Amino acid sequence: MRFEGLIGARILKRINRFAVQIDVEGRTELAHLHDPGRLLEIVYPGNEVLVRRTDGPKLKWRIEFGKINGRYVLIDSGLHSDIARRFLPEGAVPEVRVGRKRIDFRYGDDYIEVKGCTLMANGIAMFPDAPTKRGLEHLKTLETLASSGYRSHVMMIITRDDVRCFYPNFETDPKFAEAFLRLVPAYVKAHFLTFGFDGLYLRYAGSIGLCADVGHGTNGRL
């Protein structure tokens, strides 16, 4: 995926979940952050981000990448489905209703839910970085589909290439993490795709697996 017209900026403060005050081109502006996660390791005062202009009525900028450990990581979750689509067969149908819920894609008897991951510790990619009731509901929907004879998938878009394996984040959301490990791979097939940014292109860096050498104690810490 190619990115053009990106401009360097610096975070001043996060106003709310979706608005961030930035210093860009010598001016203080408000930028849209399309990611509901906490992003504490990326979105903090003084950190560098890459932004692009938008035609929004109030927010004239959109944050695309944030810097961490000397590299830029995609933090625009609005692009996750576009990225995932490149790994799905032609004809995959987006935003499919299943009862009162929606799953990101369907292709024949396969249902695919897409999640984005930016959090890493000790080489381990982790999701979520904030409690996600919606994510848990998606897992339950995938379980129901699998029990009905369909094939259920979670595609994790990990927008960094410095990770060796994935593990659900027990410390942040033990309910989601427990459900994830119960369902994967018994009911749900998980795909962990990693990506790196070279300044112009977000490139696929390969797939990783579920960590086999990670445990969690009663306090849920990795």
Curated annotation (Swiss-Prot):
GO terms for molecular function: DNA binding. It holds the Pfam family SfsA. Gene3D superfamilies: 2.40.50.580, 3.40.1350.60. InterPro entries: SfsA, SfsA_C, SfsA_N. Belongs to the SfsA family. This is Sugar fermentation stimulation protein homolog.
